[in-house]
């Protein structure tokens, strides 16, 4: 009986995803609901807002390992919770 219980515990541990995987929004629009599971090592969600270009306002969302620096006429927001880059 102990062997069966130990086997069940081991199978459960192997089958569970013990690591936490961040999910972020990834669409290039102002309002977004497309969710993406970030890769291992990507622990931040980012949202980049480009202002004043010829195409109007543009958004870029996704996952990142580090928070990028904003370039001129750009706003960058980084966060570390699921879907926090809305």
UniProtKB/Swiss-Prot annotation:
Q: Which GO terms describe its molecular function?
A: acetylcholine receptor inhibitor activity; ion channel regulator activity; toxin activity
Q: Which residues cross the membrane?
A: none
Q: Which positions make up the signal peptide? A: 1-21
- Give start-end ranges for the coiled-coil region(s): none
Q: What intrachain disulfides are recorded?
A: 24-45, 27-32, 38-63, 67-78, 79-84
Output the superkingdom of the source species: Eukaryota
Q: Which UniProt keywords apply?
A: Acetylcholine receptor inhibiting toxin, Disulfide bond, Ion channel impairing toxin, Neurotoxin, Postsynaptic neurotoxin, Secreted, Signal, Toxin
Annotated InterPro entries:
Snake_3FTx (IPR003571), Snake_toxin-like_sf (IPR045860), Snake_toxin_con_site (IPR018354), Toxin_cobra-type (IPR054131)
The entry assigns this protein to a family as follows: Belongs to the three-finger toxin family. Ancestral subfamily. Orphan group II sub-subfamily.
Entry protein name: Three-finger toxin W-V
- From what organism does this protein derive? Walterinnesia aegyptia
